[in-house]
């Protein structure tokens, strides 16, 4: 499982011109699911995203400006967007190979479980719409982007 996380000032997802999810200050997370992923790896990924320290600590003068706080500590939102293209193999040729991505039906079920778990761990969780042609708008804060992986 892979996640591309971005610290954002705000982010939103729309489908067919209708907003389906939005957050203010927080983390936009694109989630890619692979063949071997399961509920346990999904829970590990959510835990990692929620505790990954990508926000500055402006409260402690000794840590001022250092990335020392996570999204929960800054009361930020979490926007989860399914993104099978994160599982692409790009090391050969000029066309991505999506063979490593989980099959759509299984991925939809696992992504729904990932969302449900995230909502038990964090107050402000929004999502895109699985399998839809989504338009994602965000204002990247920093910019700060990190590629996270869990087995």
UniProtKB/Swiss-Prot annotation:
Keywords: Cytoplasm, Hydrolase, RNA-binding, tRNA-binding
InterPro entries: Daa-tRNA_deacyls_DTD, DTD-like_sf
E.C. code: 3.1.1.96
Reactions it catalyzes: glycyl-tRNA(Ala) + H2O = tRNA(Ala) + glycine + H(+); a D-aminoacyl-tRNA + H2O = a tRNA + a D-alpha-amino acid + H(+)
Keyword tRNA-binding: yes
GO BP term (any one): D-amino acid catabolic process
Motif interval(s): Gly-cisPro motif, important for rejection of L-amino acids: 142-143
GO molecular function, one term: Ser(Gly)-tRNA(Ala) hydrolase activity
Keyword Oxidoreductase in annotation: no
GO CC annotations, alphabetized: cytoplasm
Location of this chain's protein in the cell: Cytoplasm
Top enzyme class: hydrolase
Assembly: Homodimer.
Function: An aminoacyl-tRNA editing enzyme that deacylates mischarged D-aminoacyl-tRNAs. Also deacylates mischarged glycyl-tRNA(Ala), protecting cells against glycine mischarging by AlaRS. Acts via tRNA-based rather than protein-based catalysis; rejects L-amino acids rather than detecting D-amino acids in the active site. By recycling D-aminoacyl-tRNA to D-amino acids and free tRNA molecules, this enzyme counteracts the toxicity associated with the formation of D-aminoacyl-tRNA entities in vivo and helps enforce protein L-homochirality.
Family matches, as NCBIfam families: D-aminoacyl-tRNA deacylase (TIGR00256)
Entry similarity comment: Belongs to the DTD family.
Domain remark in the UniProt entry: A Gly-cisPro motif from one monomer fits into the active site of the other monomer to allow specific chiral rejection of L-amino acids.
Protein name as catalogued: D-aminoacyl-tRNA deacylase
Species for this entry: Psychrobacter arcticus (strain DSM 17307 / VKM B-2377 / 273-4)
Gene from which the chain derives: dtd
